[in-house]
């Protein structure tokens, strides 16, 4: 993301490197290590903005999907990603993505890793979209989606700015009450701030982690069809466990003992 972007508020500037690309390019790209592989759980959350086509499930979607995630059929690293059996990106290869997806957000396309090519990387810690999302969440909890209580924007107006920036084709949020609008804000945070180190902490503060983080992790199995198309089958690739105690970190034993046990350990530890 450009340092000169008017949306950037706080950014950590890194030097020229290719570590992000090395760690996250598809395994079939020379030098790539297939590190972060997004889940199908996340991909399914991106809204449709056109006709639903099961044979082409990544078309007509919220454009933030294409901007953030490499899907089967994407043009990436100068070629078309094909994860079907026997293809260059065959998912059966060692260290290939188990979910059928690769990270795209933050990466520079088509760096020649074998020649040591590098790019500037900046980590944006805080940006304007987060302010709008924080504002929308707080205003909704305080006054509901459509009462600005004398402030500049309503919760709905702030949320719509974020969505319009992504695509003017995204439909307006129609949630009419506080509870439904809360879910709309949470959805928008999941999409807009994907891979920016917010989702886990959001789930903790919303007390949703027990439900969400105990769901199976899903991916897709890609198969070639007659002609030049593919078929996609949702498959379970992993199980996760989140315990009630994981909402809190434990105090170290030494801290508890040094307090003469006046410091009580968090529940479950």
Regions found by a protein language model. Name each.
Residues 39-50:
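Conserved alpha/beta catalytic core and glycan-binding cleft of carbohydrate-active enzymes
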Residues 29-40:
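Extended substrate-binding grooves/exosites of carbohydrate-active enzymes
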Residues 1-27, 52-269:
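Acidic/polar-rich alpha-helix caps and helix-coil junctions
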